[in-house]
Structures are given as C-alpha cells and as structure tokens.
A protein has these predicted regions:
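Acidic/His- and Gly-rich active-site-bordering loop/insert found
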Residues: 2-102
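Zn-dependent metallopeptidase/amidohydrolase metal-coordination segment
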Residues: 7-11, 335, 342-355, 418-476
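Active-site metal-coordination/substrate-binding segment of hydrolases
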Residues: 64-146, 151-155, 161-162, 188, ...
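Acidic, glycine-rich active-site loops and adjacent beta-strand->loop/helix elements
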Residues: 76-78, 139-147, 169-172, 211, ...
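Midchain, well-structured core segments that form catalytic/ion-binding scaffolds
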Residues: 102-105, 145-146, 152-364
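Active-site-adjacent substrate-binding region
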Residues: 218, 225-227, 232-248, 392, ...
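His/Asp/Glu-rich mid-to-C-terminal helical/loop segments that flank catalytic regions of hydrolases
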Residues: 223-240, 269-272, 317-324, 332, ...
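Substrate-recognition/cap regions that form aromatic- and gly/pro-loop-enriched pockets
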Residues: 340-429
Length: 484
C-alpha cells in the first residue's frame, strides 16, 4: 500500500509532500519556503517572522465566527539520524517512506513523523472547505529539536488565540498538560598528544546495535548510552594495558540517546592477544547486563592503521575519569506524578581528536532548581579534569494547569468519541508550550498526537490507525470550541 492511499488521505498526502522537502534542524530554509508558498497558494494571510517561524491565519468556517480563536502549533524541523550503513544526505534528500504492516517508517533514517504528522494535519485543516472550525492561527515553529529557537524567538502580539493545541505528543491516548525544561551542558578542553609508541598495534573499537531513542521520553527505559559504554571499555582496559587513545567519535544530537561510538586506539603489540580476550569478555559482560533492553548490543574490534599521535597518558586518565563520573540517565523521579521522570541527563556526544575534546549533554527537569543542581554536578565532574564548562539554551518547563477550560473540552471530546477517559499527563521532554507561554501567559494549552515509537532514531515509526484517530479527535475539538 502507498502512503497516499492511507486515511485520512489529505493528511497523508501532505505528509508525503512535506517529507519530500529536506528539513533537518538548523537547515529549515527549504521547508520555510515550502510552508510560506503553501499558505499563499491558499490565499491565506501568511507571515514569516524574523526567526523563521511561519504563521498562517484562516477565518472561521461558516457559522463558527463567534467561537474563540484556536492556535494550531507544530514544528517544521526533524531530527536527522541515520544508521551508519545508510547513505543519505538530510540537507538535500527527501525521506524515503514505506508502509510496514500497521506502521509507516523510513528506510534507514528518522521518519519525521515527529512533528511532521502534526504539520500535515494543520495543512489539511487550512486546505479544507468542509471542516467546521473557529478562526485558526497556524503556527509552524523552527528548530524545536536542537534549541527551541523558533519558540524562543516568537514575539508577543502576533497571536490572538484563546487556546493553543500543540500536536507533538506521541501516544494517542494521552493529553499532555506539562513538560520538563532543559539546558545544554557543554564541556571542552585541549590535551597534549605524543608520538604513537613504536611497538604498538592499532584498532578501531566500535560500540553498535544500541536502541537509541528520545533522551527525554526514553531515558527511563534502561537503554544503554554508547558514550558511557565506550568510556567504560576504555577506562577498564587502560588500567590493564598500555592503551592510548587517538580518536573518539560517539553519539550525535543532544536529544537522542547515543546508539553508536567509535574509537581509534593502540596497545602494545606484546599485549595484543590479552587485550583482544579482555574486549571479548567485556562484550559478553555488557551483553549479559543489557540482555533485555539492548538485545542487539555489540562491540567490534578490528585492526587499523597506526595513527601518528595519541593522547598523553595522564590527560587521558583524567578525561576517562571525568566521563565515567559524569551522571547519565534518571537523576530524580517526580514526587507528585507517578512514574514520571523529574530530572535526567543525556551524555549525547563525545568528540576527541587532534588535541581537542568536546562533550555535549542535555539536562532536563520539571524543576528549575533540580535542573541547575544536576547541571552543576556534571560541571563539577568535568572541571576536576580541567574542562571548561558552559550552559546554553536553557528553557523553562510547562507548568500543568489541571483546571484549564481547554483541558475540560479536550477530555470531553475524547470521551464522547472513544468511550474512554484519556490519560492526562506531563512528560519528560521539551515541548514548546512552556516557552510559548512566557509571551502568551493567558493562552491555555494542551498537547496531543498520534502514536509514534522510536522518535529521534532510525527506528522511528508512526501507527497508521492512531493517525486516523488523532485526526477525528482534532476535528471534534475544533467543532466544539466555545463561543467568545
């Protein structure tokens, strides 16, 4: 079956058109132009702000003119992750999609259902001639995935809606009313190099086959972090062998749990056999520890050409200790909402090469003070090893308002349509609502969406039936918005 044969047809057709346009975070120029052209082609009031956000306004349908205005909001960018063996350029190529049973997925890359399905649904409402809806202000933000740049840059006074529906939640039976804030923690230092020992052999050491996933929504699931596993291997072996590091390249985006890490190392040739046995045993240890959550975990060791220079040994010890000590994973659970992560950290990327090392983390929390506490804990670990540490991109959480009028409306429509009560939740991820609310404090907000699994990884997929359910839900909400 083709994507465009799925229901609702207009939504899926829009998703296909959107995914034909390259739209990785930080490189949204093409999709911004696409969306501006789309709005103008419909003859609708279309505006691009100085940050790159696109706002398209559509008058109410006949008979709905006295209803409160609704902002429909989704982000244009997508996480650009691919499998190592996938040849793909996110800056020039469109996503290759396919129907796989009950799901739609991509071929070896992220799908972009996060948040492309939301974008496509808003496009369908803007296109419609027969859908009952109040006045619509469609807000398409940029760079949600790597800095919330669009939400942060949106000025007050551009929107007049009473309610905002964020379409970026990933479980079809959930209504989100709160989320975590976050801060980027970056550690940097230079290091001395020495000539590679003459009696050495070189290897490429790889950690592969990990689950990956969203560093907020999946952080509590026990998935392994490739950067932490690589550091554990190097730390353990450096205490037993004359091991030197030439390069490390691990992880990718801050909001994705790292799936792979690759290092170039050397050991004394007289230790070659013992070293290979040690790696084999450590691999078995890790596979046993992560047998349930990481069934495809693998560690590969292959000979490679000798590098010219390697890291000075004392500095190497300092760096390995720092990464080992830096906290990763769930730091604190919520005291008020069952099973909700309050505070966490993801050691997202490690780059070590040519005398420089960079470590990039994303610290999240629903509590501003706990967020700062964990960030300081991580900073302290790295500063002990001579790193310079900086905090950037801090953004606030979204405080739940359980008595909001829009929440009552949304819950009622869900119960009427599906005969069951939705889960009202807060999430451990960075929705834009908290940031948007700083300039629009009286605007009531909720978030919902279709079921998406594996977001931020090449395993990303969206459930087909949930998209149709989400669409019916969205239309029912719009039809039942109250009078001004």
């Amino acid at each position: 079956m083709k994507i465009t044969e799925l229901e609702p047809k207009q939504l899926w057709a829009n998703f296909a058109s959107l995914n034909a346009v390259p739209r990785p975070s930080k490189k949204e120029e093409k999709v911004i132009a696409f969306m501006v052209a789309f709005g103008k082609s419909l003859g609708l009031d279309t505006y691009q702000d100085e940050t790159g956000n696109v706002i398209i306004k559509k008058p109410a349908s006949a008979g709905m003119e006295n209803r409160k205005t609704v902002v429909l909001q989704s982000h244009l960018d997508m996480v650009h992750q691919k499998n190592n063996d996938t040849v793909f350029d996110f800056s020039t190529e469109g996503i290759k999609m396919l129907v796989d049973g009950d799901w739609v997925r991509a071929e070896g890359t992220t799908l972009g259902a996060d948040n492309g399905i939301g974008v496509a649904s808003i496009m369908a409402i803007l296109q419609s001639k027969d859908i009952a809806h109040p006045a619509i202000e469609a807000l398409f933000t940029i760079d949600e995935e790597t800095g919330m740049t669009g939400a942060k840059g949106l000025k007050g006074g551009l929107l007049s809606g009473a309610y905002l529906l964020n379409l970026d939640t990933e479980e079809d039976d959930e209504i989100d009313i709160g989320c975590a804030g976050g801060v980027d923690v970056s550690a940097f230092r230079e290091y001395d190099t020495i000539p590679t020992p003459t009696e050495a052999v070189a290897y490429t050491l790889s950690v592969k086959g990990l689950h990956g996933g969203h560093s907020g929504m999946d952080i509590h699931k026990g998935y392994a972090n490739a950067n932490k596993l690589m550091n554990r291997l190097l730390f353990t072996c450096s205490e037993k062998f004359d091991l030197h590091i030439a390069e490390i390249n691990g992880g990718g985006l801050r909001n994705a749990i790292p799936r792979e890490s690759v290092a170039i190392i050397t050991v004394d040739k007289n230790e070659k056999e013992a070293f290979e046995k040690e790696i084999a045993q450590l691999t078995l240890d890790l596979q046993h520890e992560y047998a349930v959550t990481e069934p495809t975990l693998n560690v590969l060791l292959s000979p490679t050409a000798l590098p010219e220079r390697v890291m000075e040994i004392e500095e190497q010890e300092d760096v390995l200790r720092a990464i080992y000590a830096a906290f990763n994973g769930v730091y604190k659970m919520s005291q008020s909402i069952a099973d909700l992560v309050e505070t966490s950290n993801n050691i997202a990327r490690v780059e070590l090469k040519n005398g420089e090392i960079n470590v990039y983390c994303l610290t999240r929390s629903a509590s501003e003070t706990s967020k700062n506490d964990l960030a300081d804990t991580i900073r302290a670990a790295f500063e002990l090893a001579g790193f310079e540490v900086e905090y950037t991109g801090s953004y606030p959480g979204w405080e739940p308002k359980v008595d909001a009028e829009i929440l009552k409306i949304v819950k009622e429509q869900y119960e009427n349509l599906f005969g069951e009560t939705p889960q009202v939740v807060a999430c451990h991820a960075g929705l834009e609502c908290g940031i948007l609310g700083t300039n629009y404090p009286t605007m009531e907000m909720v978030s919902f969406g279709p079921t998406i699994k594996g977001a931020h990884s090449p395993a990303e997929r969206v459930n087909i039936a949930s998209v149709e359910k989400f669409w019916k839900f969205l239309l029912s909400i719009l039809k039942n918005i109250p009078a001004k």
